[in-house]
Amino acid sequence: MKLAFICTEKLPAPAVRGGAIQMMIDGVTPYFSSRYDLTIFSIEDPSLPKRETKDGVHYIHLPKEHYREAVAEELRASSFDLIHVFNRPLNVSLYKKASPNSKIVLSLHNEMFSEKKMTFAQGKEVLDNVSMITTVSEFIKQTVIERFPEAEDITKVVYSGVDLNSYPPVWTMKGSAVRKTYRKKYGIEDKKVILFAGRLSPTKGPHLLIHSMRRILQQHPDAVLVIAGGKWFSDDSENQYVTYLRTLALPYRDHIIFTKFIPADDIPNLFLMADVFVCSSQWNEPLARVNYEAMAAGTPLITTNRGGNGEVVKHEVTGLVIDSYNKPSSFAKAIDRAFTDQELMNKMTKNARKHVEALFTFTHAAKRLNTVYQSVLTPKNKQFPPPFLTQNFDLSSINQLFVKAKT
């Protein structure tokens, strides 16, 4: 079977510039390349050839300008059984016209069906041209069916995942060695390390962590905040917000480190060097993949109860979940707890790692996607298994897992 992945026009695949979608694609590609004739379309990048076949995968990199039209031309010249469009519903109709005999699966990684993103008529047209929609969280699924109730039967949650081999938990010999190496690299061997990793954007909330440092340092004068990321993935240039962050950090210059952009393959090492990771999202986060990463690394996790974050992180079971997400004092209080309540942190991190091992690896994500593909290609099989396919979990059983972990 011929399968096509169509990335967005934002970042290239493979994920040489980072990006949650691109990292997910990289993660599931080995599974699908061993089962299908897989072609991946993405934008050009100076570090990547225009076309190549690598590890059995055909990569086609097209100019960012007129990208969607260039993809459509490629589709016209090919014959794919199934086309997976990532996070660009408004491109679906164009691709369907270019390849009318192909089945189309659309995956949503943001609130792409909102009134701000498309008209009601455009949404109807998308639904007319897709065979199935997948979403990265129940939260995103609800944003679709609240506006388009008729989409409920074709909209399925497919959670993302991580590569466990890249995240040896901190309590293992390998994880401990990485932790020691990276703490030495940044000169923080004897510090209490708070980690933020992500785009430097107001919606991600790093400014709140800087604001919280005054209170944190009163209680923990050896604390250090490591802010890893740039204004736009691999773009380390400064904008007004980044300048604001640096100015805000000046009073704590000996306690805040800006690493700038970190390549995707180096991200796991930062999680291992941290004593606590904070996902300070202010917007309705679809479901931040950093939550999976922290849990996989066995790093104590603090996240905000925004969007889909609370679907995979349960308060005091696999992490600390903050409801008062826009208050520096809330972060300071949670971070203090992470530093002082070691019994709870040890319990949560072990639970979190088991949680990821059971449900949130890239193999789990790929198998869930494959079930979607097979249901599309084999219409008679209308029964769609629950999101947690490989262990026969459903939502009630995952809640039972949390209850069991908490007792």
UniProtKB/Swiss-Prot annotation:
The keyword RNA-binding does not apply. This is Putative glycosyltransferase YtcC. One of its GO terms (biological process) is biosynthetic process. Belongs to the glycosyltransferase group 1 family. Glycosyltransferase 4 subfamily. Its EC number is 2.4.-.-. Keywords: Glycosyltransferase, Transferase. Pfam families: Glyco_transf_4, Glycos_transf_1. It comes from the Bacteria. GO terms for molecular function: glycosyltransferase activity. The gene is ytcC.
